Amino acid sequence: VPLHANSRKVIIMNAVEITIIVVAAVLLLCGILFGVVSYLVFYEVIARNSKIPGKMDANAKKKMMETNPEKFLLDPREEWLNDQTFENYSITNVDGNKLKGYLLKADKPSDVYVFGSHGYRCWGKREFRLMAKFYHDLGFNVFIVDHQAHGESEGKYIGFGSHESRDAMQWLKFMTDTFGSDIQIILHGVSMGCATVMMMSGNPDLPKNVKFTVADCGYTSPWVEFDYQLKNAHVPTSPLLDGANFFNKHIAKYDFKKVDAVESVSHAQVPMLFIHGTKDDFVPTYMVHELYDACSTDKDLLLVEGAGHAESYPTDSAAYEAKVKSFIDKYIAVESKA
């Protein structure tokens, strides 16, 4: 064989080896980059915000009040709530996190308790700053919680209804043990808090004390919600969401796909009142129709015209209250009403 042919073969083999090494290196770098980005998505969405909600640097707040004072004008109902005295309670969940709950007692003795479940990156008193007065004026007790990794409660990771519904079931046991085994409970959740109470409503262990659920602007599942948000941002869903879910399953210990409110309401144990704004572009309005159609128990639906996400109550308080009162009239014992 001529020498130049052997040389050519060596050159070709070297080129192939170099190509394989380069391709392997590129794939490795892509894998590392994918892992890093997936983890960052997981951490940004699921990990607790480092700042405690409601706390603002005094100088920053003063500057904002000077430049944009209308942002600090409180609704009279919120001002009223700020003047009320709450009883503080706590439980420790199965993860070892101390969770906080706050009771606004009715002016007169009542066996009706509204369990308030707040949304993502919010906290109890903030979410129910307007609605608390409505229920209090009806003569009901209002019990508001801070979910894990929110407000004054401990915890590192947000469960999007998975951990929160588990913890809320523990809160219900605490309530019946503390306030009476025969109390009547109304579940009321907003956004992620809505997903929480929907999952509770389909739990076969839901106590008979729960009389009905108000489900305000909840998503069908976090997987579908994240898919919707990524597509809106023109970001490819796959494999990014799969990667984030991989970290979520191993770190936060739940699967985005298995937090399924549609499945839960299909086994609902109590009547359900679904509420959603027609202009909700965060949790799109179509989701409430899927949830309503899947619900297996007595149900009703209120669509609030022009309301954005979690804005149905301030947008049309009268319609909202009227629909809730219709459920109260139907499902709460007469002697317990205001």
Predicted regions and their residues:
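Hydrolase active-site cap/lid region
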Residues: 199-255, 263
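Alpha/beta-hydrolase active-site loop
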Residues: 158-179
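Conserved alpha/beta-hydrolase
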Residues: 135-154
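Catalytic active-site module of serine/aspartate enzymes centered on a nucleophile-bearing elbow/loop
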Residues: 315-338
